[in-house]
């Protein structure tokens, strides 16, 4: 497999903390090839920036021309540019590269050093607004940079920044128990958060974040997934170690960050006040997880030995509310009664308010259901959870897994593991590698779902480390005992090694 190439056009930090030095560390941890292009040279140490010397425009142009002949990029990332002339060299080359094929542009608008030195006057700010940002795929300003670009007190949680489709406004330097970044993208919007880390080595966080995001785009991830990976890498590099100078030391991410479970962020609808607590007690589900399309089938599955069954019903077009609730109640009753007889777990899909009214205490919601919740419904669901309602959530991508984490559910479903005809969806199959990564990284149990047609597939799900495996159509074709035997066989096998990286489940940027 060819290693993706990205260009970073940024400043050279003589202290080795930020700029191209940070970009190189992030690119190495992400497993991409970085071409470091100097747009400015700085005289700085760990405490202060003493001077900035923009590289002459013709020298910057020569660097890019040389690279274009032999090392064309998948993604270009910009940092400190030094001046309007340098910015215009970049825009010209982005346009030339895009004439040859798709090239993403990640703009980290480095306008001020963390020590307070300003890198941009009014003319350069206007060039960002009028010339560079309109070409950007993603922009990653911090809160102060976003304010300078669009005006003080800008509504940062609103979309998008100066026409850029994906914006991630980083805010890890703000006080509070959580480090929160605002994400707006075509795939998802919300607050990416992780517990705040006290670290002296925090010089170059913005550079690392932007480069990691660029690298993730180069590896084929869509922007929302790329932002999740960038959050993970940057947090991993915040270390409490001794610093090489008197000021802040450099962020130092390592390749192993991708399998550190504590680095998976949550994606919250509103700014969170605290990190969500995990559900207490043993796993809510384990083993073979059946999905039935009627209450009678669900009851039969419980009687045949399944300990977890979900009832998946859809409201018919034109069906009135009263008729729907009557039908739902009639379908729920036999399944609920059978579950109680066997001490089993009965789950209702989607219809959480109706399920509660019918005495069901476990519901499953898809991502579209979560997005459809208004402020009142989110509050009501949270209150129901506090009173004991158990919850499972679907996920098909990194950002959906992060959104699920924010709800602290009882389990997360990962799918489709294999291609499925049960319902149309845009997602690529996750495969057993992504399922194993989900199982290793998720703070709650993971269920493998999608395309399970023969017992051997259930064996492989069990061996992946997942807590349970879903089967739908296969329950009508083979006896329940065949599926139970398959689960036991897989659960007794040596665990599948954790994959080094997940693969993208949607097409890239």
What are these regions (language model features)?
Residues 45-138, 144-177, 223, 227-236, ...:
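Ribokinase/PfkB-type carbohydrate-kinase core domain
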